[in-house]
Amino acid sequence: MKNCLKIIHWDRCSIEEREKILSRPILDDLSAIKKQVKTIISDVNSLGDQALYNYTNIFDKIKLNNIKISHQDLVKAELCIDVKAKNAIQVAIDNIRTFHISQNISTLNIEINKGIYCQQIVRPIGSVGLYIPGGSAPLLSTVLMLAIPARIAGCKKIVLCSPPPITNEVLYASKICGVQEIFQVGGAQAIAALGFGTETI
């Protein structure tokens, strides 16, 4: 598990460094990528967890013993986060929660004509899977902006996938936002696992 993100001081970067930071690869032909993603999805659907371990080894160059993050991993991650960072995360949580609570829609019951009622009933999705990108830009803000609205909406089960190694910040944010299960798996294989389910996910 990584401890921190790379910090770039924009004002200290040369023009070339800034251009490199802002550049994105150009993808003209997506057919090879689509073919590979279809294979990954098919493998996850048929092989389950074994496909997740295989693709984590191939793409992330990590051989995992377990894709599910343990309670001990969460405790260790929390111990690595300093008080200043915890306070900043809590401020962000409070702000996001305040915003999304104001969006909460209650059930509507409207009499459109005498004796004729229309009703809008709002029900949460029972189970949601969150995907948090990793790699060069693991965003703990994505955890907050997905998990908090899901919790406010009343989703009973919230699970999360992120490529390994998952940063301590992402683990800590997941824990305090009420994510019940965290899996260290990324890419198309994570999305397929969330959609189809595996032995573990």
From Swiss-Prot:
It is an enzyme of class 1 (oxidoreductase). GO terms for molecular function: histidinol dehydrogenase activity; metal ion binding; NAD binding. It catalyses: L-histidinol + 2 NAD(+) + H2O = L-histidine + 2 NADH + 3 H(+). Coiled coil: none annotated. The keyword Glycoprotein does not apply. InterPro entries: Ald_DH/histidinol_DH, Hstdl_DH. Its EC number is 1.1.1.23. It comes from the Bacteria. GO terms for cellular component: cytosol. Keywords: Amino-acid biosynthesis, Histidine biosynthesis, Metal-binding, NAD, Oxidoreductase, Zinc. GO terms for biological process: L-histidine biosynthetic process. Pathway: Amino-acid biosynthesis; L-histidine biosynthesis; L-histidine from 5-phospho-alpha-D-ribose 1-diphosphate: step 9/9. Its cofactor is Zn(2+). The keyword Ribonucleoprotein does not apply. Pfam families: Histidinol_dh. Binds 1 zinc ion per subunit. PANTHER family: HISTIDINE BIOSYNTHESIS TRIFUNCTIONAL PROTEIN, HISTIDINOL DEHYDROGENASE HDH. Belongs to the histidinol dehydrogenase family. Homodimer. Catalyzes the sequential NAD-dependent oxidations of L-histidinol to L-histidinaldehyde and then to L-histidine. This is Histidinol dehydrogenase. It comes from Buchnera aphidicola subsp. Melaphis rhois.
